[in-house]
Regions:
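ABC ATP-binding cassette signature C-motif
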Residues: 1-255, 305, 311-382
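Conserved short loop/turn motifs at secondary-structure junctions
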Residues: 158, 276-277
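Intracellular alpha-helical coupling/juxtamembrane segments of multi-pass membrane proteins
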Residues: 247-272, 276, 285-301
Length: 382
């Protein structure tokens, strides 16, 4: 059963065609990934599907009465409420039912009308079916999985960092448990263990979802079908990401072969026409000219652009390029309790890892001289 049908979708951005006459469907059992190079229109497609922008041409049709949940990482958060209170808003309709239930009991206490108890019983059954009394357990599961519980449930949402804020919005969306999840880069700001948890969660998700992610390892773990955007077309592949990429490469090789064969045929036909247009075979030449005019010419294949980055290298006689001594970093207060004492030698390649908010960027800014150390010092080789 198709939850979403996209027909003849066309979209341009300034003078660039993102897609032209694209077609695909999202079925009930689909865990769909969206792939393609930067700038091909993945996020634009998500905005079209969620109604944030209107497509130039074509039809985007969702099944009626479908709850589609979209990850809006820039949603506004109201100051003055804690993390848990915010997450409870995912169940606002159930809390409203609980209020109706309590009001019925109050009225029954006032007039003893048995019909009120009957209404209350129906609401009670509804709440139990919706697992209302397990809400705290559900919140704990998601908040712990995404690393929000460690921040403290009473933490004011207005005081969260950008990454923590994105986690909170994602957590609420998951708790709402929509029929379809639409996620654009959900792993942004997530640490490795949180990505692992999210992958497990999505694999167990009973609904359908569409996910855009630059993390192909994550995408490969959660998807059972792929739509790939490439040079104005949207192609759907069944199976996981590895299968889709293999099939895409096979399709590309077939296209290159077909294009080369057609070009050879065109050149051969054009040569025949030039040679025989004015001679005894002019009738045959004109016939081939008409055939050539009616030919469906294949679009020239385009090569994917590859980045070429050059980091200027300055040779140095020193074996020690960086030395820190009891270096403490932070803004108003230290981000890391222990002082840094480390060195970087000539030729070493160093990775800086750690949880979000632990101080990785702050360390780099300090070493670049953009922030002053709270304590200690460091020395760079001249």
């Amino acid at each position: 059963m198709s939850l979403l049908t996209v027909k003849n979708l066309s979209q341009t951005f300034i003078d660039k065609t993102l897609y032209e006459d694209a077609n695909f469907v999202l079925n009930k059992e689909d865990h769909m990934g969206v792939t393609g190079q930067n700038g091909v229109g993945k996020s634009t497609l998500i905005k079209i599907l969620t109604g944030e922008i209107t497509q130039d041409e074509g039809e985007v049709k969702w099944q009626n009465k479908l709850h589609v949940g979209y990850l809006d990482q820039y949603a506004k958060l109201k100051a003055g409420i804690g993390i848990k209170e915010f997450l409870q808003t995912a169940f606002s309709d159930l809390f409203q039912k609980e209020k109706e239930l309590n009001d019925l009991y109050v009225k029954y206490g006032e007039n003893g009308d048995d019909s009120l108890l009957e209404k209350a019983g129906k609401i009670q059954t509804f709440l139990e079916e919706k697992e209302f009394y397990d809400i705290d357990t559900k919140i704990d599961r998601v908040a712990t999985g995404l690393g929000l519980a460690d921040l403290g449930y009473e933490r004011d949402v207005a005081k969260l960092s950008g990454g923590q804020r994105s986690k909170l919005i994602l957590a609420k969306l998951l708790l709402q448990n929509p029929d379809v999840l639409v996620l654009d880069e959900p792993t942004n700001y997530l640490d490795v263990n949180h990505i692992d948890w999210l992958a497990d969660y999505l694999n167990d998700f009973e609904g359908a979802f569409i996910v855009v992610s630059h993390d192909y390892d994550f995408l490969g773990r959660i998807t059972n079908c792929i739509i790939d955007i490439d040079f104005g077309t949207i192609t759907r592949y069944s199976g996981d990401l590895k299968h889709a990429l293999r099939q895409k490469e096979a399709d590309r090789e077939s296209y290159l072969k077909a294009y080369a064969n057609q070009q050879r045929k065109i050149k051969k036909t054009e040569a025949y026409i030039r040679k025989n247009k004015a001679g005894s075979r002019s009738k045959s030449a004109k016939s081939r000219e008409k055939q050539l005019a009616k030919m469906d010419i294949l679009t020239p294949p385009q090569n994917n652009k590859k980045a070429h980055v050059v980091f200027p290298y300055v040779d140095t006689a020193s074996n020690l390029l960086l030395q820190t001594q009891d270096l403490v970093i932070g803004y108003d207060q230290a981000l890391v309790k222990s002082a840094f004492n480390f060195s970087v030698g000539n030729g070493e390649k160093v990775a800086v890892t750690g949880f979000n908010g632990i101080g990785k960027t702050t360390l780099l800014k300090t070493l670049l001289g953009k922030l002053k150390p709270i304590y200690g010092n460091f020395e760079l080789s001249s």
